[in-house]
Amino acid sequence: MSLSPEGPRPAPSAGGLRVAAIGDLHVGETHRRPYRELFARISQEADVLALCGDLTNFGKTPEAEILAEDLQACAIPVVGVLGNHDYECGQPQEVARILHEAGLKLLDGEAFEIEGVGFAGCKGFIGGFGRHMLSAFGEPEIKQFVQAAVEENLKLETGLRMLRNERIVVVTHYSPVLDTLQGEPPEIYPFLGSARMGETIDRFEGVKIAFHGHAHRGAYEGRTSRGVPVYNVARPVLNRDVGIEFALFDV
């Protein structure tokens, strides 16, 4: 069930964990405490915060440090993944280190359990969907491209295999389904996600919900082939299409 953070907080479902999710923060060097108040408010509404990549604008150290300062306002566990913007300056490991020291549990082939709910994820990669998914055929460059998508998907699978929970949340940056890309130009669908991740999600019955970002002009809600709910929580989608600052779900 999706809950607007603007209304009064309902009682959580029995044994449920309230998860807030948001992606595409795009923190820049000139920003000053851009999310401190929001993180403090999320801490009052949710039990866990999931960040779905593009946490910084260009993957610069000062940007990560600004976000790290704001994360100190979070009084709840924070899990998340990096996005393509966090790789732009060629130092994603440094961005990850800064955010890890600020308390972010990075999902990059790892898995975490919080109050009985499992969390797994990865950045993900591109490649397309269905019959139009790119295959490893032809030039070496194409094969390298596809291999990058395969390796990212293996990180997700590795994390999921670590979990034995009946309730699992998947967090990625790129989309695992085509549904949540509706609204984007069809020509760029292959560059917004990969069906490989959706197929992996469907192999693990414990997965109850998945969050991603990246598709700023996409749709809010979709499903995998097995029916697992998938939500595009990129900030522009939440603000424009749903009228909320963060998604909030009982899992």
Indicate residue ranges for each PLM-predicted region.
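Hydrophobic alpha-helical segments and helix pairs
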Residues: 89, 95-127
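Binuclear metal-dependent phosphoesterase catalytic core
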Residues: 2-9, 13-16, 113, 195-208, ...
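Active-site-proximal segments of metal-dependent phosphoesterases and phosphodiesterases across multiple
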Residues: 67, 134-140, 163-206
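N-terminal active-site segment of His-dependent metallophosphoesterases
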Residues: 1-77, 87-90, 142, 146, ...
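Metal-dependent catalytic neighborhoods of phosphoester/phosphodiester hydrolases
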Residues: 31-35, 55-72, 82, 87-102, ...
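Binuclear metal-dependent hydrolase catalytic cores centered on His/Asp/Glu-rich metal-binding motifs
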Residues: 117-165, 190-195
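Active-site-proximal beta-strand elements of phosphoester/diester hydrolases
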Residues: 16-26, 116-128, 169-173, 229-235
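Active-site neighborhood of phospho(di)ester-bond hydrolases with catalytic His/Asp-centered motifs
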Residues: 21-23, 49-54, 78-84, 105-109, ...
